[in-house]
Regions:
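Membrane-anchoring alpha-helices and their flanking helix-loop junctions
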Residues: 1-109, 127-187
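Histidine-centered phosphotransfer motif of kinases
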Residues: 110, 114-122
Length: 187
């Protein structure tokens, strides 16, 4: 098999998904969780986007990136996943796959959380953009857009939950000085 930029991006996604899932065993048990019905909308939007990116490869090819552009997109995916992992390691056992709070939960505002409030979602946005641009398909662009909307929805849900659980004053001060997903974006 020849390693093309797109194949490299698929491998990066596979390695990230496997290691991310395995690392879930490291997370602390939640003391309180958001009701699942409140999470359902962002899950539907996000997983529809991911399905369009990886499982529905039909539709017109809008472009085929050059080898250099393809490898630059593979680099973007690599950096994006590294940003996700930096955030996950910074959170430690506070991380959870669903919107929840652990008994020892606190506001994390260091490392990548000093750059954006949701560095995992920011990294995933970069990774879905990389795969969509490398595929060059209309369905991929729609999938990436839906996934990004889903990540943004989950970020907003987490913020509402954390304001309630950790106190609005501290979280609002953090939100005033740190953009949600895009580094250096005006607040």
């Amino acid at each position: 098999m020849i390693l093309t930029p797109l194949v490299a991006i698929y491998w990066l996604w596979a390695v990230w998904a496997i290691t991310w899932t395995l690392a879930g065993a490291w997370a602390a048990r939640p003391a309180k969780r958001m009701p699942r019905r409140e999470e359902r909308p962002h899950l539907i939007v996000t997983f529809t986007g991911i399905a369009l990116l990886f499982f529905f490869r039909g539709g017109p090819v809008l472009w085929t990136p050059s080898a250099g552009a393809g490898w630059a997109l593979a680099g973007l995916a690599t950096l994006s996943f590294a940003f996700c992992w930096w955030a996950r390691l910074t959170m430690g056992r506070l991380w959870a796959p669903l919107v929840s709070r652990t008994a020892e939960h606190r506001l994390v505002a260091t490392g990548p959380f000093a750059v954006v409030r949701h560095p995992i979602y920011a990294g995933l946005c970069g990774a879905v953009i990389a795969v969509a641009l490398a595929q060059g398909l209309a369905t991929s662009l729609v999938g990436a857009a839906l996934a990004i909307v889903g990540f943004t929805m989950k970020g907003a849900l987490e913020e509402r939950f954390l304001r309630q659980e950790l106190g609005a004053e501290a979280y609002d001060a953090y939100a005033r000085r740190t953009p949600m997903l895009i580094p250096f974006w005006p607040r």
